[in-house]
Amino acid sequence: MENRGQKRMEVVEELPADKRACNSQDFRPSTSGSSVQAQANDTNPGHENVDADMDTSSSASPSSRSDEEEQEEQDKEDSDYGSCDSDEEDPRQRVLQDYQRQRSSGDHGKLKSLLLNLTGETDPSGQLSRLTELCEVLSFSTEESLSSVMANMLSPVLVKLAKHENNADIMLLAIRAITYLCDVYPPSVEFLVRHDTIPALCQRLLTIEYLDVAEQCLQALEKISRDEPVACLNAGAIMAVLSFIDFFSTSIQRVAISTVVNICKQLSSESPSPFMDAVPILCTLLQYEDRQLVENVAICLTKIADQASESPAMLDQLCRHGLINESTHLLNLNSRTTLSQPVYNGVIGMLRKLSSGSALAFRTLYELNIGYSLKEIMSTYDISHSVSSTHPINACSNQVHEVLKLVIELLPASPVEDNQLASEKESFLVNQPDLLQQFGRDMLPVMIQVLNSGANVYVSYGCLSAIHKLTCLSKSGDIVELLKNTNMSSVLAGILSRKDHHVIVVALQVAEVLLEKYRDTFLNSFIKEGVFFAIEALLSSDRGQQNQGSADLSQKPVTKEIVKCLCQSFERSLSSSSQTCKIEKDSVYVLATRIKEGFFGPEVFNSEKGLTDVLQNLKNLSVALSELMTVPIDAHVLHDEKFFSIWNQIMERLNGRESVSTFEFIESGVVKSLASYLSNGLYQRKLSKGGPECDSLPFIGKRFEVFTRLLWSDGEATSSLLIQKLQNSLSSLENFPIVLSQFLKQKNSFAAIPNGRCTSYPCLKVRFLKAEGETSLRDYSQDFVTVDPLCYLDAVDQYLWPKVNIEPIDSVEAKDQAIECQSSQLQSTSISCQAESSSPMEIDSESSDASQLQGSQVEDQTQLPGQQNASSSETSSEKEDAVPRLLFRLEGLELDRSLTVYQAILLHKLKSESEATNDSKLSGPHNITYERSAQLGDSRENLFPPGSMEDDEYRPFLSYLFTHRLALRLKGSSHPPYDILFLLKSLEGMNRFLFHLISLERINAFGEGRLENLDDLRVQVRPVPHSEFVSSKLTEKLEQQLRDSFAVSTCGLPPWFNDLMDSCPCLFSFEAKSKYFRLAAFGSQKIRHHPQHLSSSNVHGEARPVTGSLPRKKFLACRENILESAAKMMELYGNQKVVIEVEYSEEVGTGLGPTLEFYTLVSRAFQNPDLGMWRNDCSFIVGKPVEHSGVLASSSGLFPRPWSGTSTTSDVLQKFVLLGTVVAKALQDGRVLDLPLSKAFYKLILGQELSSFDIHFVDPELCKTLVELQALVRRKKLFAEAHGDSGAAKCDLSFHGTKIEDLCLEFALPGYTDYDLAPYSANDMVNLDNLEEYIKGIVNATVCNGIQKQVEAFRSGFNQVFSIEHLRIFNEEELETMLCGECDLFSMNEVLDHIKFDHGYTSSSPPVEYLLQILHEFDREQQRAFLQFVTGSPRLPHGGLASLSPKLTIVRKHGSDSSDTDLPSVMTCANYLKLPPYSSKEKMKEKLIYAITEGQGSFHLS
């Protein structure tokens, strides 16, 4: 079917200049450029890839599911089938069965007759006629038409005819009949084998006379090899199908290799010659370009290596055949053939087995510089995709794990027994030290990078094991320089602070080896970087006293496979003792003691002093900074002078000749002192509106202004240094846990709490006990009860309160009302769960703190899909029920009410478990005590509501810094990470408000007389790139957590997950935030993980996100009234969770292309200046007046036009409502908009407050003027305070030499004379006395009240689709990328890397080279037109060309005899460009430009 579809695509070429869209049958581009026979297509078995997945996993079981699961599914299928039967269908079914019986009987009779005729026929023409008829009958027969007797009788006859020497047609038809017989009646294979069919077919392949006969032999052998691989092997089928493989087409070559794959599954090491002789041919085939062919060859070689792994002689023979040389080419990232992940991992595993058993392979890998290839793999592979946190047993099938196993195999341990192979390997490395040094130079840096990146415990253990072996083997000083350059001491210090004993033991072993071999180099470094401190901490804590190795075994899933302990996960084979941990009980304590006593004795290290000179100096500066807190807060000058002096000394140390280590930076206390000084200690307190702490906020703003000036005085260098130090400190100190869930089998459970209902996942067993001393509550009489793990503690409160309360509820209503008010206003972007009856594992798409803090969340869990907004209309009585009245404790510690029961228990358990924990121990039973809540619930009220602090110019920055402050539970028992997080958040805020803070500093300097010229107020800032605030370690942890689908779907996520994303989203990469956003906003309907897909046969060992099954709705749009169509679409589907596909009136075709173009057209329609939505910027429209362009353009992007409160703007507001809905729906469906919004408008979307300085992003010239006027007002005010009004009158307050009164400014908004600046009228003139009111009026009209209604309208429209609060985790640039895709289109490197050439074209075809040159010559507008022509949108999604799905494909277009007269055509749903083979580049450019300009605006079928 694929080729027929392809044929149709190439022949039917109507309207060539028009874009093509898919009809109801989606177009799927072929991966092959050659046309093959129907039989060849039939023999490309779909099961090959499945086999590849299974076979490349060294620990995979044959079945992807357990027997019980299969039986349950079979029972379900039987039940479903039975439910479909009815009396009405029985007669039709009987008729069908009668027809099938009659047909089978007729076919059987025909076959019998043909068999008799063939047996007695000797005339070649008669035999040919009978065979033709036999093939026709067999091709339409069913299995019921044949029997074993018939197959047994047919087999010898067909085999005899297949050996016919004189007639090629008889041979061909006989072999074709054999092929059909295997297809129709698989049991016939046994009879065919019995009658020597395989030798006959092999003979025809070894002496090829007729190509079509040979091809048919390959088809037949492929069928037979599926059921009788051993017989094929013994008959020499491997060499038969491979001997002349070069003579066949690609499709037939695939059939031949499929035969070899089937045979290799049943290889036996007892008879090596049949498959060993084939290795040279297979190695040659690895050089071919066809991916499917090369993958199957790689699978064959992997199987052969498996069988030969026990024989060093056979492994050596494989190496001599060139297996290693050809295999390593496949690992090259620039290889012509890209292998699938399972096969790629299998090749790496094959190399490991070769190296393990063959000294020749070991030497060859080193001589080929395998370290470079492995380094490239490790450095480009996403560490977050490393060993699956849910399936550690399947880690061997993971790419990073396989690489590490090969690395460890290439570093042999010193032979302690009579092991000749190990001795040969070691002597080779001793005699070739340069090879080992090169291997170390390649691998050490990347392994240390992996250790620093937050890799899980399995990968960390592998890296450390390899480093330990490398340090033991190395005999030269090169390794010392490498370790010093990669700061190994700091890495070890961080590793030793972890909780897993396996990792700690290896880290201590590495430290011991380094001290033994290179004591002089590393002794001081270990002290400076904190290794000695970490060792002492181990000795003084319980981590060093007991072995917690068993903690890792708790991570194993329920499986029939043998699970290795972590310390054996990189060993070569499973053993009967693989579950026994090798670590002795006190191994950590013994090792740590030995290192301390052997290398850090009293004569070497004074433990009482315990400080380096650098650390002591920094400690003194930290104390001085803390003492500065005692100076009165309003003493600005004194504060500035002392802070300048202290900070300059700190920076001198950080930039000094002797570097400051991460350990010294942390231990000095500088971070805590700086955080306390800048925030005046508020960052550690709970703030409340109107509290005494708020009085100090203006002074705090001043401190941050001064600190900004200090950090950015010499560009971004100083700030970057501080950020890097803080990032290193955070990576070293943070121990945020990763929750490893095992995929518990879904089962029906009953949750008594909160509302007694069935769940499809396990419940928690909890016993609620009244707290000791609690007298106002009664005992809860029941024993253990089942609790829904997804409900919030407030729901448990709501359930228990009536059962344990003694006094009437009215007595507590008064104190509850305050909480009601606070709870109703809270917003959040955290991921919460909603277990709807239809899909209990989904993630709630309407997430807010209100829903989290209210027990009504549980009621919402069973609501119908159409009632998702019902919670917004809950009654006041329901709110009262949600007020927290009980306080819950587990083992004496209070549980956090903002979490689910599962999360609250999880948070408690994580404090005492290893760094990567498992949820199997969380099901219970648990004893939770309850008592009356004595205080109001924690509230994150807005300390900066609109209208507050009107005279405080620092309000936007302080609002950003303190409104969404760090959750106090992040503080925990460890202060340094909390201090670091606050400083990083502060620096990111300063970086984000850099123009604001620097402008304020300049205005104050002008006011104080430190600046004399208004031109000196001009600010040019260089912010630090956002990427510097991203913590790679936390991002990798977040990625790993998001990949754990069960934890995500059940809210089994550690609390830091939501806390950090809510308060410090800058710490995470844009890609990680995007995944979080989609889960939080849209839930598992958009990205759904299926636990049942993670069986042992999944060689990735990881959860595969698959597209959710959201329903699709088609919408008919009208191009002439595009906004009206958009309004109708949003009215119908805006608040529904459906994917919309657009088709146009009087046009055929629907799908991705028309839908993307629809959003592009709507985007342009919203830019119509006649709508009155946006500010005008006529100067930017080059060569076209606004009224003729139809699209408003602005140098700063689109920003709402100000409208006064008295203006009639209902139409404009409706347009903004529609715009908000369209934007939200585009985000929900993953569509790209072509809407150039200004940065300031994005800030409004994100809920940020704008100030006068944000006008810089709307109208830079207006902002410049306002800043200068503000500086004059500031100078006047300060002189008046110092010298009185008479003194102020004497100072120079002119505007560039002109008095304010002489400027003749009216009280009207510049550019909008109809907008009066209250309380004055347009007739009033501006003077020095009312200048401040004039400035406030302009700012208010431009970015505050003048646009407030428009912004509220936009947000209300957006909230109809999903909560706009979910966007708050992004910054303005990221939000623009989310909405509008990439700003840059594409470069030539991207074009070469991410465009596919097929169906007649390759990357070296002349027409393709013409096209690449033309694209390179295109200007930006032509590139946009080309993209819209091919994809439907002029913008690329985030990630550029690489993110296009399907991939942009260029194929040859077959049209008329003269290609130069044809136009290119496209299929936008597949991003498919059909390009005629033009005779010249000039002709192609002419036709392409004509097509992309004139071919827009309509869709027709190809």
Swiss-Prot record:
Region (Disordered), start-end ranges: 1-107, 833-881
Pfam families for the chain: HECT
InterPro entries in the cross-refs: ARM-like (IPR011989), ARM-type_fold (IPR016024), HECT_dom (IPR000569), Hect_E3_ubiquitin_ligase (IPR035983), HECTD1/TRIP12-like (IPR045322)
Superkingdom, natural source: Eukaryota
Domain HECT: 1128-1502
Residue ranges of the region described as K-box: 1022-1096
Signal peptide start-end: none
EC number from the UniProt entry: 2.3.2.26
Active site: 1469
Catalytic activity: S-ubiquitinyl-[E2 ubiquitin-conjugating enzyme]-L-cysteine + [acceptor protein]-L-lysine = [E2 ubiquitin-conjugating enzyme]-L-cysteine + N(6)-ubiquitinyl-[acceptor protein]-L-lysine
Pathway terms, separated by semicolons: Protein modification; protein ubiquitination
Keyword entries, A-Z: Repeat, Transferase, Ubl conjugation pathway
UniProt GO BP: protein ubiquitination; ubiquitin-dependent protein catabolic process
Database matches in PROSITE patterns: HECT (PS50237)
Basic and acidic residues: bias regions: 1-21, 91-107
Biological role: Probable E3 ubiquitin-protein ligase which mediates ubiquitination and subsequent proteasomal degradation of target proteins.
Family in the record: Belongs to the UPL family. K-HECT subfamily.
Protein name: E3 ubiquitin-protein ligase UPL4
